[in-house]
Amino acid sequence: MSYLRPALVLLILLTLITGIAYPLLTTGLAHLMFSQQASGSLARLGDNVVGSTLIGQNFTQPGYFTGRPSATADRPYNPMASGGSNLASSNPALGQAIGERVKLQRQANPTQLGPVPVDLVTASGSGLDPHISLAAAYYQAPRIASIRQMPLSDVQQLIDNSMQKAIPSFFGEPVVNVLNLNMALDSHSHVKVPANPAKP
C-alpha cells in the first residue's frame, strides 16, 4: 500500500495546481491586464449591455449595416450552435442560396450596380463572424445615407473611423465590426430606425 500514498499526494497536488491555482491566476491576470476582453468584449449603451464585439448580430432593419449571412442552427448568429453550412462549393444548394442573397442585396441597395461583395452573400465558417470587409460596408453606405438622411461622406467617414487593421498588415485585410459601426451610426444620426441594434 506504500505506493498509493505518493500517488494520492501527487493527484491532490496536481488537482490543486491545475484545477484551482492556475485557473484563478490566469483569470485574475486576464481581468487585471485585459479587463474588457476577459469579460467577453461586451458593448454597452449606457448601463445596458447590447452585445459582444466578438459575436455577430442579425441586423434586419434597412437603416443598419448588415453583417455576413449566418448558417447557425435554429436562428442566425446562435452562439450555442456555431458552425457553417458545410456545403461544398459544387453543391447546387450553395449556389442557389448565394443567388438568392445576391438578389436580396441588389434589392436593398438599388443604386449599387457593381458586384456584390462576396462576404455579404457567403457565411463564415463559424456563422458568428462580427466583421465585414470595407468593400461590404461601402457597398451599403448609400442605402444607409438615404435612410438616415445623412451625407454619404459622413457615413463613409464612420466606416473609416470604425476600420480595424490587422497587425501586421499582411495577416489580413482591414475589416469593420458591424455592431460597433451601427452603434456609431446611431450616435451620429438624428434619424432613428424602429429596431434596437442590440437585439439579435
From Swiss-Prot:
Transmembrane regions listed in the UniProt entry: 6-26
> What keyword terms does UniProt attach to this protein?
ATP-binding, Cell inner membrane, Cell membrane, Ion transport, Membrane, Nucleotide-binding, Potassium, Potassium transport, Transmembrane, Transmembrane helix, Transport
From the UniProt record, which GO molecular function terms apply? ATP binding; P-type potassium transmembrane transporter activity
What is any one GO biological process for this UniProt entry?
potassium ion transmembrane transport
Where it sits in the cell: the answer is: Cell inner membrane
Task: Name any GO cellular component annotation.
Answer: plasma membrane
InterPro entries noted in UniProt: KdpC
Q: How does it sit in the membrane?
A: Single-pass membrane protein
Alphabetized NCBIfam families for the sequence: kdpC, PRK00315.1
Purpose? Part of the high-affinity ATP-driven potassium transport (or Kdp) system, which catalyzes the hydrolysis of ATP coupled with the electrogenic transport of potassium into the cytoplasm. This subunit acts as a catalytic chaperone that increases the ATP-binding affinity of the ATP-hydrolyzing subunit KdpB by the formation of a transient KdpB/KdpC/ATP ternary complex.
What's the subunit arrangement here? The system is composed of three essential subunits: KdpA, KdpB and KdpC.
What family is this protein classified in?
Belongs to the KdpC family.
Q: Under what name is this protein listed? A: Potassium-transporting ATPase KdpC subunit
